[in-house]
């Protein structure tokens, strides 16, 4: 509060600003203090109005005045509002730093105001102190005059009486140029309050003016709007501030934890080094003692050998000086044997003396450990992996996901997450929903195969790289399973149809051998049909049929209960796209709908969405939609084909094309 109070203090009077002026240099000054500055610059016979400039007492910037003098400077209304609120807070606050001084000032002002507010109705001189001010009459009264002028009867009982206040507060804002006139309009040109005379005969007569109420509503609305935006912005800033403070707290806590961990780990390393130092030092001492003991023994042996040899050498030299042959031969034989024995014994000691017992091949090489210590650093979470969609593979119920990592050496394990993709809009929400994800933890390689997936379904995959410091996830990757693969069932083929060895092509063959009758075989004359070897009861599936010159065929699906003696589409248990020469129709329950304009099909695409109940036919080569059946499936369905001429070839186990994938079309 003391710091704020110093900011609200006038540099001249050292009191809180009163009626502050906003100077062009952005500093403020009390109106009366500015007036006193002008008076101080006046010569003896010079008026204040003749002063056209003065210096700001704060920054010494020269303030140039207009013809209006100080009245031409704008009031610092914002500063005045802050001072008013500060004064209220200071008076009401029991622990205000300037409470005592403010109480004295408040009491003094009260006494001064009480002395100055005199009765305006008294005939006495001086007038008595006013006890009430009548807002209705705009007059202050002493007790005696109040009783005389405001008896307790109408209309005086309707007058509003308040504690005595100065006359200027009763009468409202007065015009700066016409002291006896109240301001009652607003000059838009000068952005100033004026009276009627200013508009009629004053310098504002040619200016654009507006009613106070109009300007009031506009300014109030603008202020309310700005205030709302400011409050909203402050709320956002407070939320951001709270998050920043919370983040700072987390940083402090985590940093303290890491510092403690660092100290603990370094102390442990130092302890290990000291232990190793002690162990290696002990080994060195033991090695030194052992080697010195051996060397001491060798030294003693050498000395003993030298002493013996010296005595023998002396005797031998003495014998060599003997010139008497008989005497020489008498002593030389014994001496020669002793010299030979001494030479042999000294030769035995020589290899031991040359043993490597000087520690010259012993070395302390800690260069590798030093490099490791120099590389010590805190561990961070690994970089996010990247899913390599071009390397990923899929079948109708499996997807093998491949990914790469920039810092694979720092990864302890990977975690694979996946879920069904239901549209672009749900990617973000799915990432925030843990319940919808399947999780495969503790993967050590850069690939993984997920089994048991739905066929013809798109999935979102994310890979998380994990180490002791944390984890980071890859961007979502979208992969989809293929459709259910199937082949033609030869046991169901009509006797006049021939199925290829790979069970993928069927053709009309009048010369086909007779086939045994089975319940699943098409039998009726003209119903030259063959079924697939699967029954589908869930998921989305897509396959294509290559038209190899046939001009009379039907392609569709049927329940297991569909009659084998009828064409497909002729009953309620089958649906078909048919070509009869140049006529193209879709057929169900004997109801035919023509396809117009007639397509020129070389390959037909069939999209079955069992769960959502639809069978759609497409021109596969030109990506043109032909027709869609909406079906509430009651039983599993089987792909079914009828051919009256030439042949048809099926291509199955395909992924659903992107332009047919409804999930790609969601917003």
UniProtKB/Swiss-Prot annotation:
Binding positions for Zn(2+) 1 per the UniProt entry: 119, 122, 142, 145
Tissue: In the fetus, highest expression found in kidney, followed by brain and lung. Expressed at low levels in fetal liver. In the adult, most abundant in heart, placenta and brain.
Enzyme class name: transferase
The EC number(s) this enzyme carries: 2.3.2.27
Catalytic activity: S-ubiquitinyl-[E2 ubiquitin-conjugating enzyme]-L-cysteine + [acceptor protein]-L-lysine = [E2 ubiquitin-conjugating enzyme]-L-cysteine + N(6)-ubiquitinyl-[acceptor protein]-L-lysine
UniProt keyword terms in alphabetical order: Coiled coil, Cytoplasm, Cytoskeleton, Disease variant, Metal-binding, Microtubule, Phosphoprotein, Repeat, Transferase, Ubl conjugation pathway, Zinc, Zinc-finger
Compositional bias (Basic and acidic residues): 499-520
Annotated positions binding Zn(2+) 2: 134, 137, 150, 159
Biological process according to GO: microtubule cytoskeleton organization; negative regulation of microtubule depolymerization; pattern specification process; positive regulation of stress-activated MAPK cascade; protein localization to microtubule; regulation of microtubule cytoskeleton organization
Post-translational modification: Phosphorylated on serine and threonine residues.
One annotated Gene Ontology cellular component of this protein: spindle
ZnF locations on chain (RING-type): 10-60
InterPro entries: B30.2/SPRY (IPR001870), B30.2/SPRY_sf (IPR043136), Bbox_C (IPR003649), Butyrophylin_SPRY (IPR003879), ConA-like_dom_sf (IPR013320), COS_domain (IPR017903), E3_ligase_FN3/SPRY (IPR050617), FN3_dom (IPR003961)
PANTHER family reported in the protein's UniProt record: E3 UBIQUITIN-PROTEIN LIGASE MIDLINE-1, E3 UBIQUITIN-PROTEIN LIGASE TRIM36-RELATED
Function field: Has E3 ubiquitin ligase activity towards IGBP1, promoting its monoubiquitination, which results in deprotection of the catalytic subunit of protein phosphatase PP2A, and its subsequent degradation by polyubiquitination.
Quaternary organization: Homodimer or heterodimer with MID2. Interacts with IGBP1. Interacts with TRIM16.
Disease connection: Opitz GBBB syndrome: A congenital midline malformation syndrome characterized by hypertelorism, genital-urinary defects such as hypospadias in males and splayed labia in females, cleft lip/palate, laryngotracheoesophageal abnormalities, imperforate anus, developmental delay and congenital heart defects.
Entry similarity comment: Belongs to the TRIM/RBCC family.
Record-given protein name: E3 ubiquitin-protein ligase Midline-1
Organism annotation: Homo sapiens
């Amino acid at each position: 509060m003391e710091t704020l109070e110093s900011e609200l203090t006038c540099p001249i009077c050292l009191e809180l600003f009163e009626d502050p002026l906003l100077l062009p240099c952005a500093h403020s000054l009390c109106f009366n203090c500015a007036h006193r500055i002008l008076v101080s610059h006046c010569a003896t016979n010079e008026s204040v109005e003749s002063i056209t400039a003065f210096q700001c007492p704060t920054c010494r910037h020269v303030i140039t005045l207009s013809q209006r003098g100080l009245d031409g400077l704008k009031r610092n209304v914002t500063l005045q509002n802050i001072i008013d609120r500060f004064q209220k807070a200071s008076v009401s606050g029991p622990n205000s730093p300037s409470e005592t001084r403010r109480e004295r000032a408040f009491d003094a002002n009260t006494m001064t105001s009480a002395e100055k507010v005199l009765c305006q109705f008294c005939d006495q001189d001086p007038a008595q102190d006013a006890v009430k001010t009548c807002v209705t009459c705009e007059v202050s009264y002493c007790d005696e005059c109040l009783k005389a002028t405001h008896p307790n009867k109408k209309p005086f009982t309707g007058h509003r009486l308040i504690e005595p206040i100065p006359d200027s507060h009763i009468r409202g804002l007065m015009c700066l140029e016409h002291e006896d006139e109240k301001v009652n309009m607003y000059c838009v040109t000068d952005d100033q309050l004026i009276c009627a005379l200013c508009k009629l005969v004053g310098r504002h007569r040619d200016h654009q003016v507006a009613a106070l109420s109009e300007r009031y509503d506009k300014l109030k609305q603008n202020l309310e709007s700005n205030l709302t935006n400011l409050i909203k912005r402050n709320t956002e800033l407070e939320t951001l501030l709270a998050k920043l403070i919370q983040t700072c707290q987390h940083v402090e806590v985590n940093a303290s934890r890491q510092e403690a961990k660092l100290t603990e780990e370094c102390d442990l390393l130092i302890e290990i080094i000291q232990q190793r130092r002690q162990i290696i030092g002990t080994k060195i001492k033991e090695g030194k003692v052992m080697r010195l003991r051996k060397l001491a023994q060798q030294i003693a042996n050498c000395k003993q050998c030298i002493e013996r040899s010296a005595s023998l050498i002396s005797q031998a030299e003495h014998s060599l000086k003997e010139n008497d042959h008989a005497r020489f031969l008498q002593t030389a034989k014994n001496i020669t044997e002793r010299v030979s024995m001494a030479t042999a014994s000294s030769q035995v000691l020589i290899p031991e003396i040359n043993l490597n017992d000087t520690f010259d091949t012993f070395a302390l090489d800690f260069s590798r450990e030093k490099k490791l210590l120099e590389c010590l650093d805190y561990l961070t979470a690994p970089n996010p992996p990247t899913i390599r969609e071009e390397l990923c593979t899929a079948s109708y119920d499996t997807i093998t996901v491949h990914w790469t990592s920039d810092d694979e050496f720092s990864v302890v394990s990977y975690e694979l997450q996946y879920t069904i993709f239901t549209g672009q809009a749900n990617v973000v929400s799915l990432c925030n929903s843990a319940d919808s994800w399947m999780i495969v933890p503790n993967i050590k390689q850069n690939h993984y195969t997920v089994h048991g997936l739905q066929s013809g379904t798109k999935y979102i995959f994310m890979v998380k790289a994990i180490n002791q410091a944390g984890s980071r996830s890859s961007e979502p990757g979208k992969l989809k399973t293929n459709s259910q693969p199937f082949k033609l069932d030869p046991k169901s083929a009509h006797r006049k149809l021939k199925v290829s060895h790979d069970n993928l092509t069927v053709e009309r063959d009048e010369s086909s051998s007779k086939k045994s009758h089975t319940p699943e075989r098409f039998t009726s004359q003209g119903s030259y049909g063959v079924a697939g070897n699967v029954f589908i009861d869930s998921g989305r599936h897509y396959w294509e049929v290559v038209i190899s010159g046939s001009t009379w065929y039907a392609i569709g699906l049927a329940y297991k209960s569909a009659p084998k003696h009828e064409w497909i589409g002729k009953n309620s248990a089958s649906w078909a796209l048919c070509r009869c020469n140049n006529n193209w129709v879709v057929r169900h329950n004997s109801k035919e709908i023509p396809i117009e304009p007639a397509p020129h099909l070389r390959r037909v695409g069939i999209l079955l969405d069992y769960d959502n109940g639809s069978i759609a036919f497409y021109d596969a080569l030109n990506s043109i939609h032909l027709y869609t059946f909406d079906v509430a499936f009651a039983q599993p369905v089987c792909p079914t084909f009828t051919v009256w001429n030439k042949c048809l070839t099926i291509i199955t186990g395909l992924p659903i094309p992107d332009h047919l994938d409804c999930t790609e079309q969601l917003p």
